Structure formats: C-alpha cells, structure tokens
Amino acid sequence: PPVFYGAAILILLFAAVVIGFPQRAGEWLLAAQTWASQTVGWYYLLAMTLYLIFVVVTALSGYGKIKLGADHDEPEFSYLSWAGMLFAAGISITLFFFCVSEPLTHFLQPPQGEAGTQEAARQAMELLFLHWGLHGWGVFALVAMALAYFAYRHNLPLALRSALYPLIGKRINGPIGYTVDCFGIIATVFGLGADMGFGVLQLNSGLDYLYAIPHTHPVQMALIVLMMGAAISVAVSGVDKGIRILSDINMLLACSLLLFVLFVGPTQHLLNTLVQNVGDYLGHLPGKSFDLYAYGGPSDWLGSWTVFYWAWWIAWAPFVGLFIARISRGRTIREFVFGVLFIPLGFTLAWMSIFGNSALEQALGGASELSRVAIEQPSMALYQMLQNYPWSRAVITVTVLVSFVFFVTSADSGTVVLSTLSAHGGSADDDGPKWLRVFWGSVTALVTGGLLFAGSIDALKSAVVLTSLPFSLILLLMMWGLHKAFYMESQRQRARSHSLAPLMSGNGKRSGGWKRRLSQAVHFPSRDEVYRFMNDVVRPAISEVSEVFREKGLAVDAQLDPGNASLSLEIGHGEQHRFLYQVLMRGYFTPSFARAGMGGLHLKNRRYFRAEVHLAEGSQDYDLMGYTKEQIINDMLDQYERHLQFLHLVR
C-alpha cells in the first residue's frame, strides 16, 4: 500500500543517514531542534492547549452524549475493566527514566529563580506535573476519539485519515489521505524510538549498577537487539494471553515499588507534597500552558523540555490513541473523555510526585552524589536514589526486571499498531500481517540505535520534535473534521424532529382497533413468526419502494435475501450522506411478567424476536411486527423525508 512504502522509504533513508554519519547527523538534529524551539515553540504550546480545550469542551457540550459507535452499541468492557486498561496505558518505561532525573534537573537548573532552594524544588514538581499532566492525555483523547468515532459510528477505516472525511470526503482514500497516515506512522516510529532509547539507557544503567556492565554503544545495541527481538517474538508468536498475564504481574510489581517508596520513605511528607503538587499544578495550569519564558529564562530550556514533551506526546498519539479507541466502543464521548483524561493521570502524577519528592528530599538533605548523577547520567538517577533505601539491591533488581517487561510490552504493542496502520489502515478488528510487525520492529530498532549513536538523549529529543511537527498540523485538521461531523450529528437530531408525517403513535397506523393493538403489544413472537413477517411483508415493501426510487433515477441498493435476518434499502446521494433503512431480526429473553402469563417457570429461557428498524446511525428502538406493507412503506418514507431534511440543514 502507498502508506507503507512512503513511510518505510522515508524512515529507512533517515536511519541510513544517521547510522552512516552519526556525528554530523547529531549536529544537524541539534541545530534543527534549536531552530524549531526558537521558531515554532509558541506553536507547540498553543496547539497542545487547543487539543486539550477541544476535548474538554466537546465532552461538556451537548455532543458529549454522542456514542462512539451506533446508538444501540453497548460498551464491550465493564467500566472497571475499561478503567483498568486505561490505567495500564499510563505506565511505561519512561516513568522510570524521568521520575527522578527530571525533577532533580529542574531543581538544580531551573528556568527561573535560584537553584537548589525549597522554591526551586516546588517549581521542579510543578514543571514535572505540567509535562506529564492533562495536556498529554488530551492529545491521546483527541486521536482516540477521532479513530473510534469515524470507525465505529460511520464505518470508515480505523485510520488517521478517516478524521478528515467531513473535510475532503472520499479523497481520504487518495494521496491526501495516504499522506496523513504516512505522517502518523513516521511520528509514531520516532516517538516509539525515543521511548525505546530512554528504555535502553535506563536498563543499561541498571545493569551497570548491578553487574558493572559499562555504558557503551555495543552494549546498548545488544540490549536493543535483545529487547526488540523479544518484543517481535511476542508480536508474531500468538502468546498474547501469556504476555497479558506477565503485563498484569508487572503492573502489580510497579505498584508495589511505588508503595515501597511511599511507606519506607518520609510518608507524611510525601502525602503532603502530593496534595500540594496537585494544587500548584491545577492553580497555575492556565498560565503555565502558555509560558514561553519570553521575559527571561535560558534560551534553550523550553526546547529541551516543554517543546520536546509536547512533540513526544503528539508522536505517541496514534499508538496510544488506537489502543484506547479499540477498547472504548459504545461509550459516550463525555465518559470517554473524562475517563481518558483522569484515570491514567491519577497514577502517573502519584508516581511522579512520590519518586520526585523522595529524590528532592534527599537532595535538599545533602545527597550531592544523587544531584551529580541526575545531571551527568540521568538514567542512573533512579538507582542512585533507591540505593539509600533498605534492601536496595533487591529493589533495584526488581526495578530492572519491571523496566524490561515494560519495554517489551510497549514495543510489542507499537509494532502491532504500526502494522495495522500501514497494512490497510482499515479494519476495526484485525491487526496487520505478522511480517509487517517484524519489519516495523526492526526499523524501530534501527532508528533507536542510530539516534543513540548520533547523540544519545539530545538526538532522541531532536528527532521527536522535528517529526511530530507535520502531524501536529494534522491533529488540528482532525479537530476541524470532528467539529464538522458533530455539527452534522446535531442537525441530524434536529431533522428527526421535523418529520413531515404525523407521529406514529397517533395516526392510526396499526389497523384493527385498539383491541388488536393491545394484543400485538403483549405478544412475544417466535423466530419463525418474525422470519415469515420479514419475508411476506417487509421484503415486498422494500422491493416496491426500491423500484420506485430507481425509476426516479436514484442510486439504490436493496438487500432482499429472504433467508437472511436482515433486509435493507440504501439510497446514495453522491458525496452527501447515504440513506439507509434496515430491518434486523433481534432476539431477547422474554420478560418475567410474560412468562408467568404463558405457563410458568418452564418458559424462563424462552426468547422472543423483533423486527427492528436501523438507520445509518444505528437502532431506532422500535419494532415493525404487526405493521402492514403500506404502513412499512409509509415508515420508510417518513425516515427518508427526515433524511432529506437533514441534508437540507447541512448544505
């Protein structure tokens, strides 16, 4: 597919340059990042804030009631299971890398104020919360919302380009749409590569502490090959159940590590600072969202930290967004947005606060070695801090093992997402072929290794800032596409209230008087009864109407197989929204009051069936059983007139 070849060629060319000319490539990347932070740093801050505002306002508005799926879809997972999966999405190996090194760096090298003071410590935690807070999950929510909404409600491909359908229509399946997916894949590869790079440095430091394995490029390349090889093996071997169990155990170990640091360390102080950190973060969030240090502060600080973080979150958005979209079908936009924003955020901020304040407490108490390590070798800072706790060697061993498993599970998921987006970018349920997982895993390993050779942490950050820039523009177009689609949803609802026919409950559509109507209401038909009704009454009605529509010159597609439990009429309107009238046979358990009236408990498992009407947006929750052919034709025309009213409103 064009998406695969375009993305693969560009990424491989970049990897070849970085590996072939590592020193010069590192200089180019650093110069480009400096240019980007000085030239478009303001844009990154503005864009990330707009993403967050958009998803929150959408959730709080009337659009928040819209489902990510058809109107009759129910969530696939219980709320508790869904929350657990969102919780897992908030944990990655980078939490281990930055939870100690970042707050100590801000403490010792603050963008404003005097270093090494209580005020510097407070500012450090505020900046840490900013970088790991709502903004990042806002961009994840935006991408996941777009993917789920267009795939599950409008049956478009589960691809990034689908969000532009309201803007460019069927051209999403042409060069414009393929370019969108291509940029998304490129951003994801470099975001995943940065994550893997930080993970390799973190694991190398852990092995150095435990077994004196040195920090060298050959060792790091060996770790990349080992861990990516494990991830690819998991991705292609079909041992999903086993890796899920391992991942669950790993999350329990991570939570145990968090509780260990909380209760073995200065517990009261850590709880106090957690609450204060949350208050400082929320209180200063609006101002910090736009703080460019335009009136003072190190010129390169913003590019190395906030701009990098915003670019990194953007790069990870297709990866995490696709995962969240797949587990969120059937949820309303309101519960989806607030679940995505706050469930994983709670754990992330608790982790950062407890580890960050533990490190700051040691630094303020005179731990000069910890401060030195945080600046000179950030990947070793966590282990240096844990060295001051009881059973430090055992705790650090567990930390290294947990980090390794998080690396493997993240890389495994990343290769699956990349193969899905590049193979077809279409099926909402199927992943890409296994060979593509091997390919993208290998390419990501090449990119990671090349960037580590080209300049380690600085090169990783620079590549992310540059490759995320085009995709950040696409996210703004996604917002526009979603807004336009939601507006059309509201107009569709408005059109329903403008029916040109009388209300069904009051126009005598059910013939035979009130006694027959009552008998029909308390009758619970069998499967065979509904089959006969659909074959003898519904099918002729749809057939007759479809012939008339064809005579009028409209594009009609009627599915009238009498052996199928589904009959449908579809009318095309060119580039405008199609009209779909579908009758589906649906089965339900007979209610208890009816079972009692039909002879008692021996009928408790009896099912009854309905001939339900579905439109393009899903079930309309009413049953046609008992209607005559003329009444069904009138109902089709009622719905078609509502559809024409909707098309009129959105022109």
Regions flagged by a language model, labelled:
Residues P1-A120, F486:
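N-terminal alpha-helical transmembrane segments of multi-pass membrane transport
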Residues P1-I11, G169-Y178, I213-I232, V236, ...:
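Loop-to-transmembrane helix boundary motifs in multi-pass membrane proteins
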Residues P1-P2, S37-W42, D71-A89, A124-L134, ...:
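Transmembrane-helix boundary/entry motifs in multi-pass membrane transporters
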Residues P2-I19, L52-V56, I91-L95, L130-L201, ...:
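Helix-loop-helix module between adjacent transmembrane segments
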Residues G6, S37-Y43, A47-L50, V180-T188, ...:
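Membrane-interface loop-to-helix entry segments
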Residues F21-A36, V55-E76, A124-H131, A146-L156, ...:
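Membrane-water interface regions at transmembrane-helix termini and the short interhelical loops
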Residues E27-Q33, L60-Y79, L104-L127, Y149-P175, ...:
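Flexible loop linkers connecting adjacent transmembrane helices
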Residues F98-P110, V261-H284, L345-Q377:
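Extracellular/periplasmic helix-exit of transmembrane alpha-helices
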